[in-house]
């Protein structure tokens, strides 16, 4: 059986990894850790205005700069996944990692469907009630559309 574990770097998502490890050891599951980088994340947006001329047009060099920034963001996500694998004890468990670029909930669902995962193990990050009401959380969207069971590890869970 295969577990899909989305990681965002928060302590809550690390606890979800720990829960997935517990299940993998007990039931001989494999684990795939994914980090989904939103295409227009906060680091990207910080630089976006610098790529525009006074008339709003995109400066020609900005395409190359944008690609470099995208690569930097993906490299950071890959380092995060590597650090998690090296810090936690995955001995005896088949583990894969992958960085995906796109809308987090959509990429999680796409990975779950395309690779036939048996379960998604993820955290429920703490959005404010107002923000959750208007935009919904990634976790809520994954739960409502997932092709497999979703185990939600509460932010207060401590393995």
Task: Give residue ranges: language-model regions.
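Conserved beta-strand positions in the Rossmann-like core of class I SAM-dependent methyltransferases
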Residues: 32, 96, 151
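C-terminal alpha-helical "lid/dimerization" subdomain adjacent to the S-adenosyl-L-methionine
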Residues: 61-72
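Generic structural signal for helix capping and beta-alpha/helix-loop junctions
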Residues: 40-41, 48, 105-107, 129
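Short, conserved clusters of charged catalytic residues that mark active-site
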Residues: 15-18, 103, 137
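Gly/Ser-rich helix-loop-strand patches that form or flank binding pockets
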Residues: 106-159
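Small/aliphatic-rich secondary-structure junction motif
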Residues: 1-63, 89-91
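Structural beta-alpha unit
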Residues: 71, 75-120, 157-159
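Short, conserved glycine- and acidic-residue-centered signature motifs
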Residues: 13, 74-77, 135-139
């Amino acid at each position: 059986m295969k577990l899909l574990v989305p990681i965002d770097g928060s302590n809550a998502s690390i606890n979800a990894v720990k829960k997935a490890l517990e299940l993998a050891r007990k039931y001989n599951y494999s684990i795939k850790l994914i980090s989904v980088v939103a295409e227009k994340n906060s680091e990207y947006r910080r630089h976006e205005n610098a790529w525009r001329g006074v008339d709003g047009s995109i400066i020609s060099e900005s395409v190359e700069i944008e690609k470099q920034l995208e690569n930097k963001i993906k490299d950071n996500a890959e380092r995060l996944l590597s650090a998690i694998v090296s810090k936690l004890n995955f001995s005896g468990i088949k583990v894969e990692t992958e960085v995906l670029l796109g809308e987090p909930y959509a990429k999680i669902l796409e990975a779950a469907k395309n690779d036939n995962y048996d379960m998604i193990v993820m955290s429920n990050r703490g959005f404010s009630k107002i923000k959750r009401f208007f935009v919904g959380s990634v976790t809520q969207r994954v739960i409502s559309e997932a092709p497999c069971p979703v185990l939600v590890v509460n932010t207060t869970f401590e393995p």
